[in-house]
Amino acid sequence: MHVSTLLVAVLLPLALSKPTPRKKTGSFKVHLARRGETEYSRDGPTDLQRAYAKYGIPTTHEMDGYHPQHISKLPGNSKATAGSGKEGVESQDEKGEVVNNPTNHDIQFLSPVTIGGQPFIMNFDTGSSDTWVMNTQMTDEEAKKDHHLYDPSKSKTASKLVDQTFDIKYGDKTHASGPVYSDVMDIGGATVRNQAIGLPSKVAASLAEDKTSDGLVGLAMTKLNTIRPVKQKTFFENLAEDLDEPVFTAQLRHGKMGSYEFGTIDKSKYHGDLIKVPVINENGFWEIPCSLYSVGKLDKIQTIQNGTGTAILDTGTTLLVLDEKIVKAYYAQVPGARYDPTRFAGWVYPCNSPMPSLFLAVGTDHMAIIPSSLLTFQSYGPGPDGVETCYGGLQSNNAGGIQILGDVFFKALFVVFDQRGPSISLAPHA
C-alpha cells in the first residue's frame, strides 16, 4: 500500500418553493462571531454526549445523569474576552464583512446571520441539512431566555409553508421540531429570498441551554433534510448556481479568528497544495474514507479492522470521535492517561503529560496530522491528588459505527467543501 504525505513549512498539518437569490453573488466571506459570556458553558463530556445523540451512538451507562464539571481554561491559554455591544456582533468593515471571534475555548464556532431583517448568531453545521432558529412561537418561555428570537410577524418577507413541518432528531435526546417558514436569509451580504427555515415550537433542553447560539444553518446534502412532505434545499445549495464556484471553505483556527467563505478558494489561507478526496454522499453527509492511522510518527500505519472505515466532516461537533481501536492506541502513548467511567465518562490524563501527534487517513492515499497541541480539549483543574486533569479532544465512538471529524480536526486543516463530485479538499492552515 502506498500512502503519500505532503510536507509543508510548519512540518505537516497535512501529510499524506424555488428559492431565488437576489443577484449574482460571486463569492463572499463570513468571519466567525462570538457572544458575550453567559452562565451556560459546555464541557467535554457534555459535548461527547451531544455527538453521540446527534448520530444515534449508544451512550455508556456512566453518561446517564452526568452533570457538567467545573471548567478551567486550557493550560497556557488566556481567557477570551467577552463580547461587547449587541451580543458580540460588531459592525461591518469597509468590505462588508462582520468581524469577531470564536466562543470561549474554541468550543463553538459561530457566525452572524440575518433572517427577515432580524440578526442572529448561528452555528454552521456540515453534519445536518436543516436551518432552524429560536423564535417567538416556542411554547417554553424558559427556552426563549437569552436568545435572539425570530418573529415572523415582524418580517415583511416571511410566509408560512402550509402543511410543511420539520423534526430534526439527534439520536433520541436532542431535537427541534415545528412549522416551516420561508423568508429572506442573508449571510455575509449574500441573500436567498425564499429560504426554508424551521421554527421549532419546542427544542430539547440542551439546545435551549446553549445561550451562545440562536440556531443552526445546515450545510450537508438535501438527503438529510427533515422537512416534510417536501424536502428543502440548504442555503448553500440554493446559492450555489450564483457563486463563482459551487464551494465553501472552513477556516476554523485554534484561538484565532476564522471564517467561512463561499464561492471561492482563497490560496492565502493554506500552505502547499490542496489534497482532493471524493465524498461518499450516499447518506447525505460530507463523508470520506478514513481507515488508516498512526500514533506519534508514520513508521507504523495501522488499519481499523471490524470497525468503521469512513468519517463525517462535521463543523457542528467539537470533538474528534474515532474508532475505539485508534483511541486506545493513542492514549496508550500518553503517560497517566485513563478512561474515567465515573467523573468524566471519557479519556483524561495529567495536563503535564507529553502528547503525541495523530496521523489519520483522509481518503485512501493521504494522511493528515493532528498536532498534539490540538488534542487537549480542556483542563478541569487539580484532582484529589493535586494533579491537573485534562480532557482529551480525541474520544471513542463507543463502537457506534460512525467516526466524526469535528472542530479538533478543522483546527488542524483548511477544508474545502465542493458540490462538484462532490468532494472535499484539505491543506494545512497558512
UniProtKB/Swiss-Prot annotation:
Organism placement in taxonomy: Eukaryota, Fungi, Dikarya, Ascomycota, Pezizomycotina
Entry function: Probable secreted aspartic-type endopeptidase which contributes to virulence.
Domain of life: Eukaryota
UniProt KW keywords: Aspartyl protease, Glycoprotein, Hydrolase, Protease, Secreted, Signal, Virulence, Zymogen
Main location (coarse class): secreted
Coiled coil: none
Keyword Coiled coil listed: no
Glycan-modified residues: 306
Name of the molecule in the record: Probable aspartic-type endopeptidase ARB_07403
Span list, region Disordered: 66-105
PROSITE patterns membership: ASP_PROTEASE (PS00141), PEPTIDASE_A1 (PS51767)
